[in-house]
Each structure stands twice: as C-alpha cells, then as structure tokens.
Amino acid sequence: MAINQSELFNEIWEEREHVSELSGKPLLPKGHYQWHWQFLHVLSKGSYPSYRLNKENIMLALPEEHAIQERFPAFIEKRDELRRKYHGERKVPYYKG
C-alpha cells in the first residue's frame, strides 16, 4: 500500500521520542500549527526524490532549527551517511564539492 507524506509523518511521530534529534529539546505537540514543520528531510526531496518517503531520511527538529540545520553535527553526520548510501545504491560516484 502506498503511503503519503502525512501518513509517514504520523508513523514517525508514533515511533520516535518527541524531542529534536538535533538539540534534544522537546518538540511542539501534535495539533500545533507548526507541527508538520518538525519533520526535516535530510536529503532534499527535489534532489533525492526516491528518499522523499524514506523514514531514514527524516529527522525530527524544531521549526527554528530547520533553517539552521547545517550547524548541527547530528544533521551533517546523517546527511553524509545517507549520501553515501544513496550513491552506493546507484553505483554512481559521489563527488563532495
């Protein structure tokens, strides 16, 4: 059965602790108008469309952390790990630039 982004976010919310994976701070409650902004795609949906609905590609973070994600070591580590995995699956060399 196909899953959409909203269903995926709900699954992640049920499975994970409700704290930012970047800072450890408590997240906004479900129902808050910014709730859906707490789901951060590590690899962008545009550049990595096959990872759009991949739970591994989504981190929980506060809305204000979303804009400064590159400042957090946890984000950098996850991004680099997923890039290696993505490019390894496609057998295309990845050049970090």
Outline where the language-model segments fall.
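Short, charged surface segments at domain edges that flank catalytic/cofactor-binding sites
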Residues: 1-24, 49-52
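Polybasic, low-complexity binding patches
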Residues: 46-60, 64-97
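Residue-level detector of short coil/turn "hinge" positions at structural boundaries
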Residues: 20, 27, 76-77
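Histidine-centered nuclease catalytic patch
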Residues: 25-58
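Extended interaction regions within the primary functional domain
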Residues: 1-13, 42-44, 62-63, 75
